[in-house]
């Protein structure tokens, strides 16, 4: 508890945004004596970050150090600015990767983006902390990806399951075999739903599969370790499952994942991720049943959060006020399809303008006037989530 009290006092003294939050709720750092006392602090919802940061750039006065003292600054869709301090393994994913068997002697293909998004560096730093060699492959270009995988004898993969599925397709098209041309024996998936079908495909190829859960803001939150059901909560943060309306903890039902970090440079305390989960029965406070959905208008597509406000902003500026976006998963690949009502057709380059904002390439389709009702949701998730039976 001393560590928690220390970071709360430090945040109150050095992060004006957090001080305002406590003062508004008439709370003093000395009021927080136990983890249970954290409930006194209002949840800071992730969806508020763009507004807070816009009013006080770049971090909404939630950072306890100057931007110039950070190692890197990233921009996630929202936009949301995320800092990285000079601390090694800042996002604390090494414990998850260690549980997945990554370490010295491994050559790991990191297919998360190194451009603006923190995901690439997030796993790069964790892998280096474990002594693994990292190939900063980034996203896209599957032909080059599998060539590197073959030539360098890559042993591990970090990225999304959908992209690895594409790489397996490309490998099969080449006629390459595990143990002969391809030596990947372990994968760590995050940022997307992992289906049992994809898990089986990997295992059929002699590849051990692990998944993890984290966010750009909080880093590692939970991960698979094969020692129990669901995902093990990280040892490096306090994780609560809370009622989205009241912020109170719940023990036997779904709720929002709320995280408190011990990071003194960017002390996110009672941070509401917007993700829904629940405790695994019999493992309350220790294991969660993965991500079961979202409580806000943000939907994760190909590892990126897409928000209704972002889509509306782009489409309204281009003269398309009536639309509906739907997220589906076909053959293991997330797709963002947008139905648009227009009497004049769709402007060339519209898809690119949307992609520039949400970082996901959409499929656009013209639809008849009146087919989208006024009260229809603008952004729907039609994917079939395979809930963990734990």
Mark where each language-model region is:
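Nucleotide 5′-phosphate-binding alpha/beta core
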Residues: 1-99, 103-104, 332-337, 344-375, ...
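Short, well-ordered beta-strand segments
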Residues: 107-110, 258, 339
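Conserved AMP-binding/adenylate-forming
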Residues: 185, 194-283, 297
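Beta-strand->loop->alpha-helix junctions that form or flank phosphate-binding loops
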Residues: 210-215, 327, 365-366
């Amino acid at each position: 508890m001393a560590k928690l009290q220390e970071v709360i006092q430090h945040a109150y003294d050095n992060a004006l945004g957090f001080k305002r939050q406590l003062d508004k709720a008439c709370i003093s750092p000395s009021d927080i004596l136990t983890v249970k006392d954290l409930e006194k602090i209002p949840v800071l919802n992730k969806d508020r970050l763009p507004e807070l940061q816009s009013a006080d750039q770049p971090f909404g006065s939630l950072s306890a150090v100057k931007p110039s003292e950070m190692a890197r600054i990233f921009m996630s869709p929202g936009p949301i600015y995320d800092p990285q301090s000079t601390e090694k393994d800042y996002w604390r994913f090494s414990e998850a990767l260690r549980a997945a068997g990554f370490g010295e002697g491994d050559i790991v293909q990191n297919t998360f983006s190194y451009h603006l998004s923190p995901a690439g560096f997030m796993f790069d730093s964790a892998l280096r902390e474990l002594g693994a060699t990292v190939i900063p492959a980034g996203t896209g270009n599957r032909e080059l990806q599998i060539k590197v995988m073959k030539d360098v004898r890559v042993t591990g993969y970090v990225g999304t399951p959908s992209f690895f599925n594409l790489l397996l397709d490309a490998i099969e098209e080449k006629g390459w075999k595990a143990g002969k041309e391809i030596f990947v024996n372990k994968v760590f998936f995050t940022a997307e739903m992992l289906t049992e079908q994809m898990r089986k495909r990997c295992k059929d190829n002699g590849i051990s599969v692990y998944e993890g859960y984290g966010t750009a803001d909080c880093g590692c939150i939970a991960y698979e370790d094969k020692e129990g059901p669901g995902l093990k909560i990280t040892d490096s943060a306090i994780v609560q499952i809370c009622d989205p309306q009241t912020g109170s903890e719940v023990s036997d039902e779904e709720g929002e994942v709320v995280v408190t970090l011990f990071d003194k440079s960017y002390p996110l305390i009672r941070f509401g991720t917007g993700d829904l989960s629940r405790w695994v029965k019999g493992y309350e406070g220790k294991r969660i049943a993965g991500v079961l959905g979202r409580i806000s208008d943000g939907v994760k597509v190909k590892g990126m959060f897409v928000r209704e406000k972002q889509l509306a902003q782009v489409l309204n500026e281009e003269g398309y006020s009536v639309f509906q976006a739907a997220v589906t998963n076909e053959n293991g690949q997330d797709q963002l399809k947008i139905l648009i009502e227009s009497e004049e057709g769709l402007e060339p380059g519209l898809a690119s303008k949307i992609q520039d904002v949400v970082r996901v390439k959409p499929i656009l389709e013209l639809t008849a006037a009146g087919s989208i009702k006024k009260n229809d949701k603008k952004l729907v998730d039609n994917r079939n989530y395979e809930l963990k039976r734990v």
